Every structure is written in C-alpha cells, then in structure tokens.
C-alpha cells in the first residue's frame, strides 16, 4: 500500500514538473516595420586639465597653433622623444609627468610616467597624428565621450576602437588610455 502511494506521488510530481517547465511562445508578425538605430549625443564638457578632442583636431589641421594650445594647459616640451625600439615622436608635451629613464643617447625606456599629484597627461606628435595619453580611467572616459559627442561614428571596434567622421579618423585605445587623432 505504501509503495503504491510513493509511486503515485512520484508520477504526479513528474507530471507537474514536465507540464510546468514549458514556456508560452508568442510570435508576432511585423510587416513592413524597419528599425533604424538612433544615436543620441549628449553635450560633454571637456576637462580643463588636458587638451580636448576639438583642440587636438585643430592642432592636426593648423600646426601653428600647437605652441599656444599646449602653453594654455601648462605642458612642457621634449623634442625628438624616442622610446627604445618602439616609438619615435617629433614632439612630446607632458604635464604632471616625469620622463622615463634614458637608456642611450636620446632614447627613453618608456612613455612618460604619471606623478601622484594632479591629472597627468601627455600629447605626442607622430607622422601627422596627435596622440593624447592620460593615466586615469575618468580622464580617458571624458576623451571618448568627447569623440562620441563630436558625431564620430564607431567604424572598427577592437583593441583600438576606430571612430570616423568625413575624412578624420580617431583611434581610442583603452588599454593604453590613449586617443590618436589623424
């Protein structure tokens, strides 16, 4: 008798489990409905501690403005900054940074290093491009927000997200916290 009760309870439990696990599938027919992605750009205020994207674009288009823009932010200049076997920059402006250790004549060990006080950043010039490097995530996020607010569209995501607008290209590398304007 007890065995029949256990079998009955097991069958009822299994029946309830199997019938309650199903989901109701709803399908709708959308005829002629097309969706277009809507991009909303918010007004982003550029940080007053380092160069804005607008100013970087201006420096690429008008190289004669480089000195006045970098002076406004208090950047120091180091010409012909070369990172040993890696990169070479015609001009390296840095602020709240110290230059890396010199390995050989005019060749440095690495990019400039941040100081603990203030927002550290550098602006490097290489083959017609301006590279803005920052050292904290909020400063990098501000730069990327400026790129998006300037109506640049993500063209190629990856290690360096490439944004395009007309013939202007901006690459944002989150790992290095750099923004390259060409």
Residue ranges and their predicted role:
Residues 58-79, 136-156:
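Amphipathic alpha-helical segments
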